[in-house]
């Protein structure tokens, strides 16, 4: 936002990004920059190029803060991973924007995602990530659920939902099997096949948590059935740095599954309240039904 002689003028996201780019590279010409939005459920990412530089701009947005998104944390995490070659490199952290390198390559297609050869690549990438030193940002799941509860549409609340929420807030969580740095939003839209290999993008929810929780999130997010889950676990546990006891890991994933389902349900409900977009109600409905939440 800026002020003119006639009053307040609100700048668009693209105008704000353009200003950030021109401050970062003051010798470039503003008119040479081309900016376009990138697809996603939050619509806060932009691609920018002037022919010489190719940049992804990720905005710090107020609704994202309510969901736990923090670009300063994401900046620190990506710098932490800079030697692993599994994530984009940070160009700069400037006010309101995280600027990243644009990675050439193609997003993984849905039909490619569950193929055996791809599962091997994905397992190798995730075991590499899960074997890194901790980020230093542990997942505060109860705090997250409590925060989301304050932001949902109160018109949708029912006594059964209140009882369910109290149960998750007060019940003991599964013990940690292996604490690791994790991505928490692994799906085909966030996986990029590049000339340098498979990479993960969109690290805004990355955290430190149990690998069982992370893999339960992977399975839920991608709607993998039992055979697909077992295929992946064989690949994951077969990696040199994979978790060795596949049976124990599978049990741990099952223990975490209700917690993951509820976390994702709450995310959809908050996004519905924020955006009014009915797609979030549709995405939430199967999870609501699994918990017996009806109107």
Annotate each PLM feature.
Residues 5, 159, 266-295:
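ATP/Mg2+ or Mg2+-diphosphate-binding catalytic cores
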Residues 12-29, 134-184, 194, 245, ...:
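An alpha-helical support segment within catalytic cores of ATP-dependent transferases
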Residues 25, 126-134, 172, 222, ...:
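A general structural signal marking secondary-structure boundaries and capping sites
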Residues 28-36:
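Conserved N-terminal boundary motif of the eukaryotic protein kinase catalytic domain
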Residues 36-138:
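ATP-binding pocket architecture of kinase catalytic cores
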Residues 41-51, 55-57, 169-213, 227:
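Active-site acidic catalytic loop and adjacent metal/ATP-binding pocket
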Residues 71, 251, 255-259:
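Start-of-helix signal in alpha-solenoid helical-repeat scaffolds, especially tetratricopeptide repeats
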Residues 212-243, 258-275, 290:
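Active-site activation/catalytic loop segments of kinase-like enzymes and analogous catalytic loops
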């Amino acid at each position: 936002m800026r002020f003119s002689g006639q009053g307040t003028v609100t700048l668009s996201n693209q105008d704000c990004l353009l200003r950030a780019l021109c401050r970062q590279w003051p010798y470039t010409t503003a008119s040479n920059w081309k900016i376009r939005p990138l697809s996603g459920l939050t619509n806060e990412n932009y691609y920018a190029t002037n022919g010489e530089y190719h940049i992804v701009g990720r905005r710090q947005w107020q609704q994202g803060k309510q969901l736990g998104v923090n670009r300063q944390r994401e900046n620190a995490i990506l710098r932490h991973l800079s030697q692993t070659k599994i994530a984009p490199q940070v160009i700069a952290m400037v006010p309101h924007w995280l600027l990243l390198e644009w990675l050439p390559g193609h997003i993984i297609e849905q039909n490619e995602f569950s193929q055996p050869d791809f599962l091997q690549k994905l397992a190798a990438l995730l075991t590499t990530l899960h074997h890194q030193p901790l980020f230093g940002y542990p997942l505060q799941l109860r705090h997250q659920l409590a925060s989301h509860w304050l932001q949902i549409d109160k018109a949708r609340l029912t006594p059964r939902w209140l009882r369910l929420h109290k149960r998750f807030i007060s019940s003991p969580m599964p013990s940690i099997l292996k604490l690791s740095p994790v991505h928490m939003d692994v799906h085909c839209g966030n996986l990029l096949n590049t000339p340098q290999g498979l990479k993960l993008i969109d690290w805004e929810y990355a955290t430190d948590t149990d690998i069982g929780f992370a893999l339960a999130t992977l399975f839920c997010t991608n709607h993998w059935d039992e055979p697909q889950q077992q295929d992946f676990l064989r690949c994951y546990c077969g990696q040199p740095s994979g978790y060795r006891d596949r049976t124990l890991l599978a049990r741990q994933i099952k223990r975490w599954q209700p917690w993951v389902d509820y976390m994702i349900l709450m995310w959809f409900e908050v996004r519905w309240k924020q955006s009014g977009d009915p797609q979030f109600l549709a995405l939430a409905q199967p999870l609501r039904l699994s918990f017996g939440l009806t109107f």
